Amino acid sequence: MAKYRAGRINEEVKKEVSSIIHNDIKDPRLSAMVSVTDVDVTKDLKYAKVYVSIFGNEKAKEESLQALKSSVGFIRKEIGRRVKLRNTPEVIIEVDNSIERGMHIDELLHSIKENKSNDN
């Protein structure tokens, strides 16, 4: 039962954080290509690790990450207002590069397939 509740809390916090990032944060450094890939709330609801994927060049990624990290207080306040929990978790922003790694692997597989078809 506890795992089921934790999963529901993770999904609800993920949905709200994504909405907050896209609709409520007005920082010009934040690019539109930021997506929340996962949220992991601890069992005691004290901390929420928010994994974000940021597309763009390195400078845009760094600026977007700084904008998100400077907005964690606002994000936490909004989570507390929107999600009814006993404790509002402290938000920790982490970068998730899994989508980029997946795209790179897909490109490698595509190039191998092209090389194989050219050899035949």
UniProtKB/Swiss-Prot annotation:
NCBIfam families for this protein: rbfA (TIGR00082)
Compartments (UniProt record): Cytoplasm
Cellular component GO terms held in the UniProt record: cytosol
Signal peptide residue numbers: none
Keywords attached to this entry: Cytoplasm, Ribosome biogenesis
Biological role: One of several proteins that assist in the late maturation steps of the functional core of the 30S ribosomal subunit. Associates with free 30S ribosomal subunits (but not with 30S subunits that are part of 70S ribosomes or polysomes). Required for efficient processing of 16S rRNA. May interact with the 5'-terminal helix region of 16S rRNA.
Keyword Transcription regulation annotated: no
Stored Pfam families: RBFA
GO BP term, example: maturation of SSU-rRNA
InterPro entries documented for this protein: KH_dom-like_a/b (IPR015946), RbfA (IPR000238), RbfA_dom_sf (IPR023799), Ribosome-bd_factorA_CS (IPR020053)
HAMAP family in alphabetical order: RbfA
Descriptive protein name: Ribosome-binding factor A
GO molecular function, one term: ribosomal small subunit binding
Subunit structure of this chain's protein: Monomer. Binds 30S ribosomal subunits, but not 50S ribosomal subunits or 70S ribosomes.
Similarity comment text for this entry: Belongs to the RbfA family.
